[in-house]
Design a protein with these regions (language model features):
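Hydrophobic beta-strand residues in large extracellular and virion-surface proteins
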Residues: 81-83, 131
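Short, hydrophobic/aromatic-rich segments at coil-to-beta transitions
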Residues: 64-68, 123-132
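Extracellular/lumenal carbohydrate-interaction signature centered on repeated Trp-anchored short motifs
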Residues: 92
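Sec-dependent signal peptide recognition
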Residues: 1-8
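N-terminal targeting sequences that direct proteins away from the cytosol to non-cytosolic compartments
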Residues: 5, 14-79, 86-89, 98-114, ...
Length: 181
């Protein structure tokens, strides 16, 4: 018993030191695996549709989920436009619109409310849905979204800008979404 106590006591004192500083260590990175990524042009060749970019819009860096990203200037700010595509219905209109509403601090809407807020527009693929989502209590951020069904997938185009920016860029956004071919 005394031997165990002495061993514990020895370990305790041995592990303590008078150093009052935090030590940090740097380790070399493990060799990373090289992933051969397709160029943007190769990826764009795989997209089964195209669009016409408004003259005042600029391409932006796209993320892993975006097919393309754009920015558009308006008086008072810069809008972010994203294009994403998902197989099938992409989760459905109710889930997507309510996710966007939540991002703007709004409560979920019923499918009937959402359906009543949809404006139908036309592109070469046929009709698409246009939805404007605005939180009147927070005018610094609003969404203008389109849902375009193309073959066996759903394409979502979303503009994020202030309420004022949405009003200024709405015609360009509609022309852009209508240009999908």
């Amino acid at each position: 018993m005394i031997n165990k106590f002495l061993i514990v006591l020895f370990c305790f004192f041995y592990s303590c030191d008078n150093n009052q500083y935090i030590n940090t260590y740097k380790l070399p990175k493990a060799n990373s695996v090289s992933i051969n990524r397709s160029s943007t042009e190769d990826i764009n060749k795989k997209i089964p549709f195209s669009w016409d970019i408004p003259a005042k819009w600029n391409e932006s860096n796209k993320s892993s989920m975006r097919l393309a990203s754009f920015s558009a200037s308006y008086i008072g700010g810069l809008a972010d436009i994203s294009i994403t595509s998902f197989s099938g219905q992409g989760g459905g209109i109710l889930a997507n619109v309510n996710r966007w509403r939540k991002q703007l601090g709004l409560n979920p809407a019923s499918l009937n409310q959402i359906t009543n807020s949809i404006v139908m527009k036309k592109s070469e693929f046929g009709n698409y849905k246009l939805i404007k989502i605005i939180n009147e209590k927070e005018p610094s951020s609003a969404f203008l979204c389109s849902i375009i069904e193309i073959k066996n997938s759903t394409v979502f185009v979303k503009m994020n800008a202030s309420v004022n920016g949405i009003a200024q860029l709405e015609e360009e956004f509609i022309a852009f979404c209508s240009s999908f071919k």
